[in-house]
C-alpha cells in the first residue's frame, strides 16, 4: 500500500535516534521523573548491534504482526517498526506509554495498548486464525506468567523470541533428567521447539541486571502432540506430578486415579512405577494424560 509506505518513510525521517547510551537513558528517566522499577523487572536494552541481531533472527517478515511487551524507551520498538513489522506494543508503565505515544504515534504500523500484559485477553487481540509473532525484551518479573498466558491462549503466536533471565531460558529449553526441567518446560515444549540462541551479559542493559540473560527462540510445532480437548487435563497432570517431583510417579498417579487404576495405567503406558516425574518426556506426559482420562474422566471444561 503506497500510502502506508509513504507515512512510514515520513515517520522514519522525522524520528529521533533511539539508540541511547547510558547517560542519555538516565537523562530521559530523570526527565520523566522515574527510576527503573526492579519490581517490574525493568532493564532497558541499549546495544544497537544486539537489537539488530534480534530483528534479523526473530523469525518475523515484513508485514507480519508482531507483539512486543514492555517496550520501555522503544529501542527494540524502533527496530521492529523499521523492519516493516506491524507492531502491537503493550506497556504497563503510564509514563513510558506516554513517551511511546509521542515517539511512535505517527508510525502507521504501530499500535500501543496501555495495560498489564498478564491480564490482556489475547484471544480478543489476536482472534483464531490470526497469525502473529511475539518479540520482546520481557520484563523479567512477569516472564513466566506472561509466557504461560500465551500458552493458554486458543491462538498462540507462530513464534516467540524473548530476552529472558538465563536461568528462565534454561528452564524453558531443559531436557528430561535435568534439574532445570519442570512443569513450565513441559507445558512450553508441548507447543514449541525451544532453544537458547545467545547468552547476553548484564553490561548491555541499564540498569544492568544481577544475572546473565538469554535470547530464547520458540517455534510453534507443525504437528500437535496433544489431541484437542485435553489441554486442561494435561496442565493439571503436569503440575500435580511436578509439585512433588522427588516422589515416584506410581504414587503420584495413584492420588489422582486410585492405586489400582494407576497400576493399570502405568502397565499400559509401559512406565515403571518408580520413575520420577522429571524423567518423563513431553510425549510421555501426553500418553499419561490420554490414559488417565480414559480411567478417570478428568474435567476438561
Residue ranges and their predicted role:
Residues 2-3, 7-240, 264-267, 278, ...:
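Catalytic cores of RNA-modifying enzymes
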Residues 243:
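Active-site-proximal catalytic alpha-helix in oxidoreductases
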Residues 254-255:
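Short helix-coil junctions and helix-kink-helix linkers
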Residues 260-261:
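Alpha-helix N-cap and coil->helix boundary residues
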Residues 271-272:
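Primarily EF-hand calcium-binding motifs
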Amino acid at each position: 500500500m503506497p500510502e502506508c509506505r509513504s507515512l512510514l518513510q515520513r515517520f522514519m525521517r522525522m524520528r529521533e535516534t533511539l539508540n541511547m547510551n547510558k547517560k542519555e537513558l538516565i537523562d530521559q528517566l530523570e526527565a520523566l521523573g522515574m527510576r527503573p522499577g526492579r519490581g517490574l523487572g525493568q532493564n532497558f536494552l541499549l546495544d544497537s548491534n544486539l537489537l539488530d541481531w534480534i530483528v534479523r533472527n526473530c523469525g518475523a517478515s515484513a508485514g507480519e504482526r508482531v507483539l512486543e511487551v514492555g517496550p520501555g524507551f522503544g529501542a527494540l520498538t524502533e527496530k521492529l517498526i523499521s523492519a516493516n513489522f506491524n507492531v502491537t506494543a503493550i506497556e504497563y508503565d503510564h509514563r513510558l506509554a506516554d513517551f511511546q505515544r509521542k515517539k511512535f504515534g505517527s508510525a502507521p504500523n504501530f499500535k500501543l495498548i496501555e495495560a498489564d500484559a498478564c491480564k490482556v485477553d489475547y484471544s480478543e487481540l489476536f482472534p483464531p486464525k490470526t497469525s502473529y509473532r511475539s518479540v520482546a525484551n520481557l520484563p523479567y518479573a512477569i516472564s513466566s506468567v506472561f509466557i504461560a498466558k500465551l500458552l493458554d491462549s486458543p491462538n498462540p503466536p507462530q513464534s516467540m523470541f524473548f530476552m529472558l533471565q538465563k536461568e528462565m531460558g534454561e528452564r524453558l529449553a531443559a531436557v528430561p533428567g535435568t534439574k532445570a526441567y519442570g512443569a513450565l518446560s513441559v507445558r512450553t515444549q508441548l507447543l514449541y521447539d525451544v532453544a537458547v540462541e545467545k547468552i547476553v551479559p548484564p553490561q548491555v542493559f541499564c540498569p544492568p541486571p544481577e544475572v546473565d540473560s538469554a535470547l530464547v527462540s520458540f517455534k510453534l510445532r507443525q504437528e500437535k502432540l496433544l489431541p484437542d480437548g485435553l489441554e486442561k487435563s494435561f496442565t493439571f497432570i503436569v503440575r500435580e506430578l511436578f509439585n512433588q517431583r522427588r516422589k515416584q510417579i506410581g504414587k503420584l498417579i495413584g492420588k489422582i486415579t486410585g492405586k489400582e487404576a494407576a497400576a493399570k495405567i502405568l502397565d499400559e503406558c509401559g512406565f515403571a512405577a518408580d520413575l520420577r516425574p522429571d524423567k518423563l518426556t513431553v510425549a510421555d506426559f501426553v500418553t499419561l494424560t490420554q490414559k488417565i482420562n480414559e480411567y478417570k474422566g478428568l474435567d476438561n471444561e
